Structures are given as C-alpha cells and as structure tokens.
Swiss-Prot record:
<dbReference type="InterPro" id="IPR013783">
    <property type="entry name" value="Ig-like_fold"/>
</dbReference>
<protein>
    <recommendedName>
        <fullName>Protein 4.2</fullName>
    </recommendedName>
</protein>
<dbReference type="InterPro" id="IPR002931">
    <property type="entry name" value="Transglutaminase-like"/>
</dbReference>
<dbReference type="GO" id="GO:0005856">
    <property type="term" value="C:cytoskeleton"/>
</dbReference>
<keyword id="KW-0519">Myristate</keyword>
<feature type="region of interest" description="Band 3 binding">
    <location>
        <begin position="31"/>
        <end position="39"/>
    </location>
</feature>
<keyword id="KW-0133">Cell shape</keyword>
<dbReference type="InterPro" id="IPR036238">
    <property type="entry name" value="Transglutaminase_C_sf"/>
</dbReference>
<dbReference type="GO" id="GO:0060586">
    <property type="term" value="P:multicellular organismal-level iron ion homeostasis"/>
</dbReference>
<dbReference type="InterPro" id="IPR013808">
    <property type="entry name" value="Transglutaminase_AS"/>
</dbReference>
<dbReference type="GO" id="GO:0003810">
    <property type="term" value="F:protein-glutamine gamma-glutamyltransferase activity"/>
</dbReference>
<dbReference type="Pfam" id="PF00868">
    <property type="entry name" value="Transglut_N"/>
</dbReference>
<dbReference type="GO" id="GO:0005886">
    <property type="term" value="C:plasma membrane"/>
</dbReference>
<keyword id="KW-0597">Phosphoprotein</keyword>
<dbReference type="Pfam" id="PF01841">
    <property type="entry name" value="Transglut_core"/>
</dbReference>
<dbReference type="GO" id="GO:0048536">
    <property type="term" value="P:spleen development"/>
</dbReference>
<comment type="function">
    <text>Component of the ankyrin-1 complex, a multiprotein complex involved in the stability and shape of the erythrocyte membrane.</text>
</comment>
Length: 691
C-alpha cells in the first residue's frame, strides 16, 4: 500500500494554491481550488526513492466527492501520475522531484463536479491512502468553464468583492444601502455546500445552471419558512434588532442553523442578497439588481388592477397582483448550452412557490435577453418577468354601493431605473437598457405587439391593453410632490386641475396619504382631506397643500413609504381622475469624514457627525462601527441624548489590517429610528519598505 513508497506526508500547499486560484480570502490552511486550473501538492517519502520510473508506474490518484462516489456519474476519478498529463480530464504530472519528495501538479476538468473532495493515493491496486481534502469551485478565469467572464474588473466585482450596495427607495429617490455579502467568511462555503447537498443529483453539480436553480429554490423555501411577521409594537432595543440588515452571513446562518439574525417580512428583499453571496462563494459571478415600480403577482398578464375608495385611499389588496415600489433579484453569469444561441450571459434567478415540479420546478433561470425580446416560449418565467417591467396599470374606484368605476389615471410606467452597483466603484449603474428597449421606440412597439399577439393566441386573454376611456366633458388632474420627505418634517404638494370644456364644473377633490411597505402592501392610513371646488370653463387651477407629519393619525411604521393619492370627480361625469406619487421618508444625514488613503497597520481616525433635524430629542443613541479589514470586530458606543438642532460628534480610531479598497460602515440606532447607516471607502496601501 502507500507505505510501499514510504509516504511520510502530503503538503497541499494551501496558501500558495489559494493565492493562485483567487481563494486566499477563504483560507490559508484549507485548500480551495477552481476547476480547470492546476494546483500543486508535494509528496514526502519516509525513505529515498531511487527508481523513479518504476515507482511512477505503480501509483495513481483518486479524487472523489459526494456520499456515494461513482465513476459513472463523474463524482469519482482515478488517474495516473505521469510525466505528460491530460489537461481535458483529471491528470497529475510530476513537475519536480528528488529522492525525498515529488512535486505534483494536479489538473481538474473545466466541467468537473464542484464540492468537497477527498484525494487518495493508490499503489499497485492496494488499499488507498487518504492524502487530504480539498474543495473544488467554479472558475470564471477559465475559458472552458461555463461561468467564464473575460473582463477582470467584472470578475473582481461580481465574484471577489464582499462590499456591496443594494438600491432601495423609489424610482425618484434611489437610496444606496451598504451590504456585506461576506462570501469568504469562514463558514459560508460549508453552509453553501451543506445547502446544496439537499439536492441528491450530485453528478449535476458540474452545471452552473442546475446549481443556481437548486440554490435559488432552496433559499426561497428557507425564506418562506424562516421569515417572521414584524411585531406591531416593540421596545427600542428589540426594534433596533429587528431592523438590522447589514449583511448576508448572519441571515444565512439563521436560515440554516437557527443561529444568527432573524429576518422579518418587511425585509424579505434580502433573499436576493443572500443568493448572491452563495453563488459568489461557489464561484458563479452574481449581482443584486433592483427594479423600481415592479408589477408582481400578475400571472404574466400585461394588465394590473389597483383599487381605491372614494376618498382616494388604497382599498386593500389587488385581485391580481400589485405594483411593488421596488423589487430585488439576483443575476448570475453563465452559458446556456441547452438554449438556442444568443442567451448566454446574465441570467435572472426567479424562485417561486413549489408547483409540483420538485425543487427545480420552483426556481427558473431566465436569460435577461429573453425578457428584453419577450421570448415567451423559451422558459416559463419569461412571461412573469416581462410583465413585471411592461405591464399597464388600471385604477378602479370602489364606490359605496359596491360597484367599480374605471378612473382616468396617468399611465404608471413599471420597470423603471433597473439598477445595480457599478463595477469597481460605488456609483449606481442603470441597466434598464438590458431589460427593455427605450420607452416609445420602434423596437419596444414591435416587441410589445408580438408579445400581445402571442398571449392572446396562447391564453385567450383579452386583458392586454387598458380599457379605452371616452368622455365628452374632460377634466385633467396633475399631482406634484417632492420625491422625499424628511422624517417628522413637512413639505408642500400641489394639485393642478384643468377644465378644457366650455362649462363650469363642480369638482370634489379627495387627497390622502397612506404608509405602504416596499411590496405595495398597505401599512397604515395616515391622513385624508376633501375639497369642494368650482372650476370655471377653460381654466387651470393649482391647489397647494401643506403635508405635515404632525397631522398624521400615527407615525409611519419603520421602513415604509408614503403613498400620496388624489382623486377628482365632477358632477357631469361618472369618470374620476386619479393621480399617485410615492414618497421616500428620509432620516437625518449621517456624515463620515475619513482620509481616502491609509497605510496598513497604521492608526486611522474617522469622524462621525449627526445633526438632529427632528422636532424631538434623539434618545438611547448607539453608534456601531464595522468594516472588514479595518476593524476586527464590530464596536458599539452609547451616547447621550441629542436635542433638536444639536449635533452629535464622535471620533473613532482603528488600525487597518488588509490592503486594498476597504469600507467603513457606521450605524446609528435611537428611539426615533433604527438602522440609519452610511459608509465610506478607504484605500489601504502596504507600508513602504525602508531602504
């Protein structure tokens, strides 16, 4: 057996190999390698080996993964140690040798099954000797790998960067949320493969399409099982905990082990970020994408109905879906060999409720190009995703007698400002052009007409275009409001009514404000006002109204938006005019001052300031600072109360330990709000060597 060669030990050269395979952030002790790329091990012998060629002919290596390794399903491979090797299959070549050791280069196939492997040595068919374990990952640097990404800057961003930005807010007030993907945290690789192991088709782990769909489905299932309803009331400390949303790793730990940070229903958008972490960890380039004004739950229909009462307030839930203020999704990069040519590149992970098709049946993988072109027959989810960014909204008025009346509402454009973090920077990149042709363009018209025709033929669904409205006595309504409103602040809104007819009109105007969650679900009714106006013939009238937090029936729940609506009705027509604006609630600005460049192992100081722009004191203030490569562990500091118009200032000193672009994240929690964050990036350079 192995003792015939007198094997003393095997050095897997983890630090060196991990450096060459872009996995050094995972570990310097455990071996993590990427498929299709050689890695080096060193065999040490107990006694000198004089006859090299005879000894070489007697030995072979076996690499195996999974619970039941098999050569048939490509989870086990036995291959000789030679002087040539086969770069297309498992191979091993002696690169250097002496009497005491052999340096062996092992190459894995570019389409090998990923996962935890055991490497064994076999001598002359006798019992195998375990040399050690390694983990094999996808390889975006290898042209033969299905996840190959040729741009180095994109590989650095979509695979190696742990500091992310996720875009929340509204289409008119996009807010960047600092996010720690943490794909190289110590236990993330094991948690990810543990999750993947629930799929017993290990032989298909060589296919990134299969792996992505399995992970998307399992994470969606975990989210549905683990996401908790947000309590209506909670103490300040509990509220601060509920709204923590700094990164993927605590969430992944909670979902898989029950230990970590819980997620509540108002934050279920984090699924896209957790999926991005797991995909990047396994070697699949991925990014989080946000679509503003996204039509969800339409069943692929290109019409979405919204219902409002006579006061202009949203009347419960739509029968067929609703428009989300924003919706996050995960894109991953890979080839699609099973699809027609032209659908390689970015794919959208689209999990859904299980429909009897097993794990894969509850997560589709949709080429972005298929959504843009409206290729409905390519894969089932194209229809849903196309509708999400192209549907038309129809607004109905629910009358007191139970009848529904169609309103004349301005077209709500869905699928706006589709955004993701820019490559190598903190800027917001608009990628709407990847998903749809320009609004009003000939290409957009052609795609929509083709999709409408196909839907009517396939589904016999006439609900494609909004119902036409005709009125002999038109009234026009225009609503203007700021894109954001300071927390506990005030603003001016204006309503413009235009009477183009030759007759005077008696108009009833209803204006309302509601708090809504990001997914369009009503959270609270806050304020309403009714006006009775007389509008002269051929006249335009502008009504200006103050919007004050102090007039609201209650404070808007944390992490909600204001939905401002206006509905105008006149006596000569049953047709009401309707307009709506979504307003982001902005909290006080958290300012961070810090040098743009710092030296490794040299103290660095950051200054943090927060002015209380509210009308009440900020009490129970806690500042937390964190940053991988800058601060070993999160630090938290308690501060005194900050009175209105006063400013809280603090300085923090820490010592950077990692070279490269690092990010400091600062968070403030108090009785008035939780999870107020900001971030600042710093480039850490290695110390100059003294002459």
């Amino acid at each position: 057996m192995g003792q015939a060669l007198g094997i003393k030990s095997c050095d897997f050269q983890a630090a060196r190999n991990n450096e060459e395979h872009h996995t050094k952030a995972l570990s310097s002790r455990r071996l993590f390698v990427r498929r299709g790329q050689p890695f080096t091990i060193i065999l040490y012998f107990r006694a000198p080996v004089r006859a090299f060629l005879p000894a070489l002919k007697k030995v072979a290596l076996t690499a195996q993964t999974g619970e039941q390794p098999s050569k048939i399903n490509r989870t086990q491979a036995t291959f000789p140690i030679s002087s040539l090797g086969d770069r297309k299959w498992w191979s091993a070549v002696v690169e250097e040798r002496d009497a005491q050791s052999w340096t062996i280069s092992v190459t894995t196939p570019a389409d090998a099954v990923i996962g935890h492997y055991s490497l064994l040595l076999q001598v002359s068919g006798r019992k195998q000797l375990l040399l050690g374990q390694f983990t094999l990952l996808f390889n975006p640097w290898n042209r033969e790998d299905a996840v190959f990404l040729k741009n180095e800057a994109q590989r650095m961003e979509y695979l190696l960067n742990q500091n992310g930005l996720i875009y929340l807010g509204t289409a008119d007030c996009i807010q960047a949320e600092s996010w720690d993907f943490g794909q190289f945290e110590g236990d993330v690789i094991d948690l990810s493969l543990r999750l993947l192991s629930k799929d017993k088709q290990v032989e298909k782990w060589s296919q990134p399409v299969h792996v992505a769909r399995v992970l998307g489905a399992l994470l969606h299932f975990l989210k549905e099982q683990r996401v908790l309803p947000t309590p209506q009331t909670q103490a300040t400390q509990e509220g601060a905990l509920l709204n923590k949303r700094r990164g993927s790793v605590p969430i992944l730990r909670q979902w898989l082990t029950g230990r970590g940070r819980p997620v509540y229903d108002g934050q279920a958008w984090v699924l896209a970020a957790v999926a991005c972490t797991v995909l990047r960890c396994l070697g699949i380039p991925a990014r989080v994408v946000t679509t503003f004004a996204s039509a969800q739950g339409t069943g692929g229909r290109l019409l979405i109905d919204e219902y409002y009462n006579e006061e202009g307030l949203q009347n419960g839930e739509g029968q067929r879906g609703r428009i989300w203020i924003f919706q996050t999704s995960t894109e991953c990069w890979m080839t699609r060999p099973a699809l027609p040519q032209g659908y390689d590149g970015w794919q959208i992970l689209h999990p859904s409720a299980p429909n009897g098709g097993g794990v894969l049946g509850s997560c589709d993988l949709v080429p972005v190009r298929a959504v843009k072109e409206g290729t409905l027959g390519l894969t089932p989810a194209v229809s849903d995703l196309f509708a999400a960014i192209n549907a038309s909204c129809v607004v109905w008025k629910c009358c007191e007698d139970g009848t529904l009346e169609l309103t004349d509402s301005n077209t709500k454009y869905v699928g706006n400002n589709i955004s993701t973090k820019g490559v190598g920077s903190d800027r917001c990149e608009d990628i709407t052009q990847n998903y749809k042709y320009p609004e009003g363009s000939l290409q957009e018209k052609e795609v929509l007409e083709r999709v409408e025709k196909e839907k009517m033929e396939r589904e016999k669904d006439n609900g494609i275009r909004p119902p036409s409205l005709e009125t002999a006595s038109p009234l026009y309504l225009l609503l203007k409001a700021p894109s954001s409103l300071p927390l506990r602040g005030d603003a001016q809104i204006s309503v413009t009514l235009v009477n183009h007819s030759e007759q005077e009109k008696a108009v009833q105007l209803a204006i309302g404000v509601q708090a809504v969650h990001y997914n369009g679900v009503l959270a609270a009714k806050l304020w309403r006002k009714k006006l009775h106006l007389t509008l002269s013939a051929n006249l335009e009238k502008i009504i200006t109204i103050g919007l004050f937090f102090s007039n609201f029936e209650r404070n808007p729940p944390e992490n909600t938006f204001l939905r401002l609506t206006a509905m105008a009705t006149h006596s000569e027509s049953n047709l009401s005019c309707f307009a709506q604006e979504d307003i982001a609630i902005c909290r006080p600005h958290l300012a961070i001052k810090m040098p743009e460049k710092a030296e490794q192992y040299q103290p660095l100081t950051a200054s943090v300031s927060l002015q209380n722009s509210l009308d009440a004191p900020m009490e129970d203030c806690v500042i937390s600072i964190l940053g991988r490569g800058l601060i070993h562990r999160e630090r938290s500091y308690r501060f005194r109360s900050v009175w209105p118009e006063n400013t809280m200032c603090a300085k923090f000193q820490f010592t950077p330990t990692h070279v490269g672009l690092q990010r400091l994240t600062v968070e403030v929690d108090c009785n008035m709000f939780q999870n107020l964050t900001n971030y600042k990036s710093v480039t850490v350079v290695a110390p100059e060597l003294s002459a």
